[in-house]
Amino acid sequence: DCYRCLIQWGINSAGNNGSEGESGWYAFPVNFNSACFALFCGLRNTDTNNPTKYDSEVQPRNWTTSKFNVYKQDYGGDPWFGSFIWFAIGR
């Protein structure tokens, strides 16, 4: 039951580098009162200053009612983690 659910979304920087690993924490614009039920993330773009590089993937890693972080996954080659979009549902 999602009566009075809170839906949030945004765009954040994934660090603008090719480093794989866990990111720092990102704050939700508004804290969820009791729980964040689900968090979805996807890469938005590559850096136009580095056109030979490509994005790999960001995965939701940990989240609380006030913040979250992601894991930047490199599948090989020459990655570049630019910005990513996120969507969260909670109460």
Give the residues covered by each predicted segment.
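Extracellular attachment/recognition segments
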Residues: Y3-R91
